[in-house]
Amino acid sequence: MIIRSPEPEVKILVDRDPIKTSFEEWAKPGHFSRTIAKGPETTTWIWNLHADAHDFDSHTSDLEEISRKVFSAHFGQLSIIFLWLSGMYFHGARFSNYEAWLSDPTHIGPSAQVVWPIVGQEILNGDVGGGFRGIQITSGFFQLWRASGITSELQLYCTAIGALVFAALMLFAGWFHYHKAAPKLAWFQDVESMLNHHLAGLLGLGSLSWAGHQVHVSLPINQFLNAGVDPKEIPLPHEFILNRDLLAQLYPSFAEGATPFFTLNWSKYAEFLTFRGGLDPVTGGLWLTDIAHHHLAIAILFLIAGHMYRTNWGIGHGLKDILEAHKGPFTGQGHKGLYEILTTSWHAQLSLNLAMLGSLTIVVAHHMYSMPPYPYLATDYGTQLSLFTHHMWIGGFLIVGAAAHAAIFMVRDYDPTTRYNDLLDRVLRHRDAIISHLNWVCIFLGFHSFGLYIHNDTMSALGRPQDMFSDTAIQLQPVFAQWIQNTHALAPGATAPGATTSTSLAWGGGDLVAVGGKVALLPIPLGTADFLVHHIHAFTIHVTVLILLKGVLFARSSRLIPDKANLGFRFPCDGPGRGGTCQVSAWDHVFLGLFWMYNAISVVIFHFSWKMQSDVWGSISDQGVVTHITGGNFAQSSITINGWLRDFLWAQASQVIQSYGSSLSAYGLFFLGAHFVWAFSLMFLFSGRGYWQELIESIVWAHNKLKVAPATQPRALSIVQGRTVGVTHYLLGGIATTWAFFLARIIAVG
């Protein structure tokens, strides 16, 4: 920690009225670019308009102006998010069976969309129970609302209106902070102040207010709901907040107020701030008292963290000092210079944030099923599957985005003249060693993981089950994973003496939790089948990383194209007369990385979907006998490629393929349509530009003959544009196909 003389008191951190508000200018397409603003000569114009509209770097090189545009755009983004949330709450208020679901969440399905009968599509309104007909939703909003203590549709209306007000406020803020009071560059670069405010304000006070809401509103209301009290009889949130006696009836220590807090007699609060672990047997969700305790603890941590960085008071940590002190034995100057990179290149900053947020999103996916946070979430299998799949896809996209912006940083913002012998320079100088080793790892993993399956398929085809890798023949048990499971299952008695149960039932060690005759969670066994598919996960992840990392490390130069930096982030080839230099731009690596990200995530969600249906989800009889949805067939069927095709893809696609004429028929149509969208992508990916240009010339000739030729000249898509359209339809088609396949299946059987 370094103590410096305090900085001068008053800093002017905004410019007043920097840019006038002009609707005339905005109405002109391409106003941000001299070339595009001239209007279209060829059809390429519309593609350039879309490509460059949000590429603020191409509008100006002034970092302050770029920063203001990004800042303003963030408010626009928040406005859209509030608008979307408002729509979700409005549907809950206007078109849903929320109040009915609240009274009987085990027998009534959540629905918040009722289809209007226009051409007979009211068939989609299935019977979700309780006499309500609508589309079953799998977003988890009902469970979230119950956990928040929302007991009526009126409360949802109010929240929806509140979100609209916030959306308007955000739109105003976006305009105000660009046109009326725009922050100076120094404000965007003041990282210590930003850290303090974000840590203490957003994360600290945000968590504290949520903990407060949970203690004063959610806990008492859920206490009543769990006891079977009619939601209409339960006091309203403001009554709990204003009347301490009401709370004291449920939690006697409330009568003492804040005295135990100030007298350090904190154990008095153990009634509603618990450390139980495991799941509430009534709802199959985490104990809400544990969740409140968790948010309170998180709030304390972040409030402290938000006071650690040096600003006007000359005390605390400085980010620059921390980074420059960070030197390892093999990394030369270490992190010296990273501070300058991260305060002058928003692409570098964004890249780090995307990598961390993407990883965090995938962590969320894995916790949503192993530690289901909301009441009745664990037994809503459609929602569980949707939440896992959604967070996996989002995480995958964010991580590819991290590589994209790292490469843009390398091309546009990296200055090799000022970087010598720091961490980044060291990595770039031995990039060949990194990439060739990574390539070797990919080859090893690919041949060995796939080879295990091929061996099993061959032995199975030859009728030699005793020679297969399986739990009943040659075992390949995941011993490390089982050891980790065991360690966590035993933790309450050993490493976590304060907890009564382990963090998740998935580790093992406990009895299954069932709600309303359905399994919420049970110890998840791991065996040879999991060992095999986990190595496929390792393979696909490493290949994705290989492609993306190669794109970043060779973004500026390579042996093939030493002057790559001059060609920019995306270019088709290194000019005419240099064969074999196509698809080498940093953009192309992102393009290729997206396909492998899609491979990787697909295997993960297929593994999850089948494993849960086979070994976890199912019903339980009065005698305590569990019947799983697919009867535990994962361990023996998923060990061959044929098993995956026959017993997973084909067997479980029967619901979506046979959905016509039922309330699930929309999924059948989506399944078909999304296959078409996916196939359409191949037309762009497997075809050359010249083919289309020739075809266009011929069509233009016909138009000229008929004297209906347009003023704007038609042009074939450029190579990069064609690939963009291709990968977009490939991913969109693939994801929508998977969505229809999963949901038709799980809504029918779950």
UniProtKB/Swiss-Prot annotation:
P700 is a chlorophyll a/chlorophyll a' dimer, A0 is one or more chlorophyll a, A1 is one or both phylloquinones and FX is a shared 4Fe-4S iron-sulfur center. It is found in: Plastid, Chloroplast thylakoid membrane. Keywords: 4Fe-4S, Chlorophyll, Chloroplast, Chromophore, Electron transport, Iron, Iron-sulfur, Magnesium, Membrane, Metal-binding, Oxidoreductase, Photosynthesis, Photosystem I, Plastid, Thylakoid, Transmembrane, Transmembrane helix, Transport. Chlorophyll a' binds at residue 675. Chlorophyll a binds at residues 683, 691. Its EC number is 1.97.1.12. The chain crosses the membrane at residues 70-93, 156-179, 195-219, 291-309, 346-369, 385-411, 433-455, 531-549, 589-610, 664-686, 724-744. GO terms for biological process: photosynthesis. One of its GO terms (cellular component) is photosystem I. Gene3D superfamilies: Photosystem I PsaA/PsaB (1.20.1130.10). It is a multi-pass membrane protein. Phylloquinone binds at residue 692. Its main location: plastid. Belongs to the PsaA/PsaB family. The PsaA/B heterodimer binds the P700 chlorophyll special pair and subsequent electron acceptors. PSI consists of a core antenna complex that captures photons, and an electron transfer chain that converts photonic excitation into a charge separation. The eukaryotic PSI reaction center is composed of at least 11 subunits. This is Photosystem I P700 chlorophyll a apoprotein A1. It comes from Oenothera elata subsp. hookeri.
